[in-house]
Amino acid sequence: MKLPEDSHIAPEKLTRYLLVPQARGDKSAYLALAGYTLDNFTTLLTDLRAQILNQDATALETTSYGQLYEIRAPLVGPLGRTLRVRTIWMTEYLSGVTKFITRIPD
């Protein structure tokens, strides 16, 4: 199934989490391999919409907040390098809005 085209991707999820080096559970180094940095976070935002969100999603678990989904797909970065990624999304019960939750190497 496809998730809605207008699924919400909070810029803060990229600029305060995915693209920021962390002592534990760092996700920024993997994204940097393809050329994604804080300086071009809008490119990652655009690429998540254009390359990932249009792929088929698989339903995962149901939580008290909503239904979780995953999308596994290649992500081609600004340097032309392809990363295998697994993205997690959630459709909230209260709002009905589908949101980007996180990205995991695949």
Over which residues does each language-model region extend?
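Compact soluble domain cores
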Residues: 1-70
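Short, compact, well-ordered microdomains
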Residues: 63-106
